[in-house]
C-alpha cells in the first residue's frame, strides 16, 4: 500500500509539473511566485509552532495555489484590471485549483488551503462567508504569504508590505499569520521588541 501511495504521489507531482509548464507560458514568473509563496507559507507555519506535517502541507499549498489558473482565458490572466464579468471568471481559479488537487489525491489540508486562501478573515469575501478560525489555518497562512510575495513582485518594499499587513489584520488577514509574515519581512524590528 505504501508503494502504491508513493507512485500516486509521484504521478500527481508529474501532472502538476506539466500543468505549471503550460501555465508558465501564459504567466511569466509563476514558478518563482509559487516557490516564494511556498517558502513563506512554511516559515509562517513554523513560526506559529505547527507540527512538521502541517508545515510541509503549508509549503505544498503555497507551491500549488495557482494551479487552477491553468483554465483561465489569456485575456483575463494578462490584464491588471478586470471588468465585473471577467472578475467572476477569474474567481473560478480557486475552486478549479481545489478540484484539481482533490482529484490528484493530494492532502485534504492542501486542497482546503487552496480553496479558501482568497477569503478575508472577517468573512467579507466571496468564499462561503467563512470567517476567523472557521477558515482553515493553512488557508490563512497561504493568504498572507501569497499577498506578501505578490506585492513584492509589484515593487513594494518589505516595509510597505509590512504596514499593509498591519492595517489589514483582523479584516483581510489572521492577526497571528500577519505578525509572522511581518517578522519574516522585518526580522530586525522583531528583535527590538
PLM regions: where:
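Membrane-proximal linker segments that couple transmembrane helices to downstream signaling/catalytic modules
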Residues: 8-15
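Metal-dependent catalytic cores of enzymes that make or break cyclic nucleotides
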Residues: 13, 20, 24-193
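Heptad-repeat alpha-helical coiled-coil signal-transmission segments
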Residues: 1-8, 30
Amino acid at each position: 500500500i505504501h508503494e502504491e501511495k508513493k507512485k500516486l504521489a509521484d504521478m500527481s507531482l508529474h501532472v502538476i509539473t506539466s500543468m505549471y509548464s503550460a501555465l508558465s507560458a501564459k504567466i511569466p514568473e509563476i514558478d518563482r511566485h509559487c516557490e516564494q509563496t511556498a517558502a513563506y507559507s512554511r516559515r509562517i507555519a513554523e513560526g506559529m509552532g505547527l507540527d512538521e506535517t502541517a508545515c510541509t502541507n503549508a509549503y505544498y499549498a503555497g507551491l500549488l495555489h495557482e494551479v487552477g489558473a491553468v483554465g483561465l482565458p489569456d485575456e483575463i490572466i494578462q490584464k491588471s484590471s478586470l471588468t465585473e464579468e471577467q472578475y467572476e471568471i477569474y474567481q473560478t481559479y480557486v475552486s478549479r485549483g481545489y478540484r484539481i488537487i482533490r482529484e490528484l489525491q493530494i492532502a485534504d489540508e492542501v486542497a482546503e488551503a487552496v480553496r479558501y486562501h482568497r477569503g478575508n478573515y472577517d468573512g467579507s469575501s466571496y468564499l462561503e462567508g467563512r470567517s476567523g478560525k472557521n477558515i482553515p489555518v493553512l488557508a490563512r497562512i497561504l493568504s498572507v504569504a501569497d499577498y506578501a510575495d505578490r506585492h513584492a513582485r509589484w515593487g513594494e518594499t518589505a516595509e510597505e508590505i509590512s504596514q499593509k499587513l498591519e492595517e489589514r489584520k483582523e479584516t483581510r488577514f489572521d492577526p497571528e499569520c500577519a505578525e509572522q509574515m511581518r517578522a519574516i519581512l522585518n526580522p530586525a524590528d522583531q528583535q527590538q521588541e
